[in-house]
From Swiss-Prot:
SMART domains tied to this protein: PCRF
Highest taxon in the source lineage: Bacteria
A molecular-function term among this protein's GO annotations: translation release factor activity, codon specific
Coiled coil region boundaries: none
Keywords: Cytoplasm, Methylation, Protein biosynthesis
Places the protein is found: Cytoplasm
Name of protein: Peptide chain release factor 1
GO cellular component, one term: cytoplasm
A Pfam family annotated for this UniProt entry: PCRF
Main localization, broad class: cytoplasm
Length: 359
């Protein structure tokens, strides 16, 4: 087949896809739910590659036929350039699909929002960010669960932990879209507590982790854990549960603390807290093992300081600016209502270009 796609790469994919198809058709596989999920997820990841390859093969066959016809009848010659362009476009698309990618792109995520400098205004902005991600998830049919939240006096979030899951096995999951959101987000607006109408600057931080499919994928020694239980609390710290159902898990070797209080029972809260802990430990282990991953993660929140910003939300000018790529748009209300695709597409494009340049 003409084009730049490496034959060995696509041959490997074809063989893997055929093998997965056989596995998934075997009823015995589904006796092991974890293995079935992994096979299904990988099968879904390969689906766009297989579809693009089929289109490319069909277009190449059409091109070969058109060239043969044009050799005998010049009236067919006009079709050749069009088909050549189609083959080149599909070949490039297939090459992009076969390029090295983030192994977590199909994963769900744990997302944390933390208020920073700015007191109540920062907490209110943190809740605006959390709502932005919830609305974005809803637009994509994803499932969102607020695992834990500490609410400020005015109803903002001092901190909140969200679990965001995609609607099924997909090549590009939640992580592929939201992985660039980690960092310090700065807001410029007139706070509700400001009586003089002056614009203030405050900040909130976002941390995001790919969530392992199974807690067992991450090695966690029970003796390294301190588990505390307490009553779930509502707005302003008021108790909303008469039993000690909320769970706080401290991983003693790293000092990582995870809390969960939104499930119905202590057992459910512990299970969800363990999932969050596994995600954070997995991220920490990958940082330690991979210098590139470490450098990237350092761009997330170290200290929620207004000077370390990835993005600014300017209310007086209705403008959002992503400082990493120079992206600007004047639709702040829409962005905060979850219309993030244009921005996330631009960030993804910049990341792909950087990866290709580094090869």
């Amino acid at each position: 087949m003409a084009g730049t796609t490496q034959p060995s790469a696509i041959d490997d994919i074809l063989a893997e896809h055929a093998g997965l198809e056989q596995q998934l058709a075997d009823p015995a596989l589904h006796n092991d739910p974890s293995a079935a999920r992994k096979a299904g997820k990988r099968f879904a990841e390969l689906a766009p590659i297989m579809a693009t390859y089929a289109k490319l093969k069909s277009a190449q066959d059409d091109l070969d036929a058109a060239r043969e016809l044009a050799a005998d009848d010049s009236s067919f010659a006009a079709e050749v350039p069009e088909l050549e362009a189609q083959v080149l476009e599909l070949d490039k698309a297939l090459t992009d699909l076969l390029a090295p990618r983030d192994p977590h792109d199909g994963d769900d995520v744990v997302l944390e929002v933390k208020s920073g400098e700015g007191g109540e205004e920062s907490a209110l902005f943190a809740s605006d960010l959390a709502r932005m991600y919830v609305r974005y998830a809803e637009r994509h049919g994803w499932r969102v669960e607020i695992l834990d939240a500490t609410v400020s006096d005015l109803g903002g979030y001092k901190d909140a932990t969200l679990s965001i899951k995609s609607k099924g096995d997909v090549r590009d999951g939640v992580w592929a879209r939201l992985k660039f959101e980690g960092g310090v987000h700065r807001v410029q607006r007139v706070p509700v507590t400001e009586s003089q109408g002056r614009v203030h600057t405050s900040a909130a931080g976002v941390l995001i982790y790919p969530e392992p499919e199974e807690v067992e994928e991450v090695q966690i020694d029970e003796t390294d854990l301190r588990i505390d239980v307490y009553r779930s609390s509502g707005k302003g710290g008021q108790g909303v549960n008469t039993t000690d159902s909320a769970v706080r898990i401290t991983h003693l070797p790293t000092g990582i603390v995870v809390t969960c209080q939104n499930e119905r029972s202590q057992l459910q809260n512990k299970a969800r807290a363990m999932q969050v802990l596994a995600a954070r430990l997995q991220a920490a282990a990958e940082e330690a093992a991979d210098a590139e991953a470490s450098a990237g993660r350092q761009s997330q929140v170290r200290t929620v300081d207004r000077s370390e910003r990835i993005r600014t939300y300017n209310f007086p000018e209705n403008r959002i600016t992503d400082h990493r790529i120079g992206f600007k748009s004047h639709n702040l209300d829409a962005v905060l209502d979850g219309e993030l695709d244009a921005l996330l597409d631009a960030l993804g494009k910049s990341d792909r270009e950087a990866r290709l340049a580094a090869e």
